[in-house]
Amino acid sequence: METIWKFEIKPKDGVIEIMMPIGAEILSTGAIDDSVFVWAKFSTDDDTESEPRYFEVFGTGHNIPVDMGIDRKFIGTAFMHDGSLVWHIFERI
């Protein structure tokens, strides 16, 4: 059996650590009210342990460092306050 959970990501400078079940597949991102979330699917067949996952959030027009030896995977874009705040979520891989 599988399930989907949402995990809150609080936009801030730097890396955001979120504990997720091992092997969780990130499905999408979005905003609800004043919060940004990612949704992830994972198996509930085992007693799945958690692992840290690392995310970064950048606003439109903000600088994204590229010379740090870090690989990032784009997860999605979240719109807040009727689109006046736009966040782009990346996972460090």
Language model: regions and residue ranges:
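Catalytic phosphate/metal-binding cores of nucleic-acid and nucleotide-processing enzymes, i.e., regions
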Residues: 1-93
